[in-house]
Amino acid sequence: MDLKATIRTLPNWPIEGVMFRDITTLLQDPAAFKEAINRFYDRYRTMKIDKIVGIDARGLIFGAPLAYKLEVGFVPVRKKGKIPFRTIGAAYSLEYGESMVEIHEDAILKGERVVVVDDLIATGGTVKATIDLVEKLGGEVVECAFVIDLPDLKGREKIRDYKMFALMEFEGE
């Protein structure tokens, strides 16, 4: 199945000059959604993985079913103020300012091997902040997995010390 063909491209959204890659069309197609999860599963099923870490918001959509299928725990990393209990946070840069992601302080145990999942990697700020949280808790990032890689935005450079896997790439910004 050509998963790339299930992604809708919206020119000039949310601002002029941006080519927005919309995964909702993949999600609306049950065969495509299943295929995406199965491709991730095939990649990780023989690796010793303890947890899948899904990044808010769309990484949660792919991370939770992958964790279920792998029979491992699932850990959500959310934007600041979205999860209860005690958390630790990490900041990352945006075009005009800063944002923060958080994780429960007891979500990952020392030595646990995790795969970080998000829908796409663009500049890499969110995934790098998530890696920092996992490592602060003592976890080991086995790989970062994405549905889409936007290589021209150079996010891979921010996580060059980590393995990375993407189901597809789109050139351009």
Swiss-Prot record:
Kindly state which reaction or reactions the protein catalyses.
AMP + diphosphate = 5-phospho-alpha-D-ribose 1-diphosphate + adenine
The annotated pathway is: Purine metabolism; AMP biosynthesis via salvage pathway; AMP from adenine: step 1/1
Q: Which PROSITE patterns match?
A: PUR_PYR_PR_TRANSFER
> What SUPFAM superfamilies does the database record attribute to this sequence?
PRTase-like
A GO molecular function for this record? AMP binding
Q: Which GO terms describe its biological process?
A: adenine salvage; AMP salvage; purine ribonucleoside salvage
Keywords associated with the record: Cytoplasm, Glycosyltransferase, Purine salvage, Transferase
Query: Where, per UniProt, does this protein localize?
Result: Cytoplasm
> What does the entry list under GO cellular component?
cytoplasm
* InterPro entries referenced in this protein's UniProt entry, alphabetically: Ade_phspho_trans, PRibTrfase_dom, PRTase-like, UPRTase/APRTase
Where mainly located? Answer: cytoplasm
Q: What Enzyme Commission number(s) does the record list for this chain?
A: 2.4.2.7
Give the record's subunit note: Homodimer.
Q: So what family is this one in?
A: Belongs to the purine/pyrimidine phosphoribosyltransferase family.
What is the stated purpose of this protein?
Answer: Catalyzes a salvage reaction resulting in the formation of AMP, that is energically less costly than de novo synthesis.
Its recorded name reads Adenine phosphoribosyltransferase
